[in-house]
Amino acid sequence: MELVSTVKDSVDLKSFGFSKYSGNYRGAPVEGAFSPDGKYLYFTNYAMYGKGFNKEGTDKCSPSSGYDTSFLSRIDLSTYTIDAVYPVGSVPKVVQVTPDNKYILVSNWCSYTVSVISVAEQKVVKSIKIGRYPRGIVVTKDSTFAYVAEMGGNRLHRIDLATFEQTYIPIGSNPRALVLSPDDKVLYATMNLS
C-alpha cells in the first residue's frame, strides 16, 4: 500500500454557490463514507475556519450554544478533488450513505439533528430532531431504515427513510457506535459510559 494523493480540506465556498462567503475556508475532517459505487468519498468537518466562522463548536454543547454550522465535503475519487459541499449542522460527526445511493445522512452533534441530503437533488431535504448528541448511524441493506445513536441519552432512533418518521429503542446510557450484522438481523451498539 502506498500514498496516492493528499486532498487539502480547504474550499472556496462561494464557488459552490454559498455567496455570503469569500476566499478559501479550511475544514476539520472527522469521519468519512464512500458512495455505494465507489466514485465519491464524503467527509464531515467538525468546524470550518475562515471569515464568517467565529464560534467553533465543542463536544459540550446544545443548539442554544450558538456555535457555527459546518459543511459536508465530497471528494471525486477520479481526480482527488473536492467537487461538492453541503451545509449541515453544528459539529457534524458521522456520515453514512444509504445503499441505494438516495440519501446521505449526517449526525450533527451540537444541533441535536440528522441532516438528510438527497443525492439526486444535491441538497439537504430534511433535518430530523434526535436529542442530545446524535452519533453513530447505520442503514439497513434495503435502505428502508436508518438507526441513529443518541449518545447523550439512552435510546436508538429508528428512522423510516420513506416517511422520516421515528420510533425508539431503549438501550441504556450513552450509545455511541452502531454496527449491523451482515444479514441485518442484529444491531450492535457500543455504550460509552456503561
Feature locations, PLM:
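Predominantly soluble domains enriched in secretory-pathway, periplasmic, or organellar proteins
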Residues: 1-194
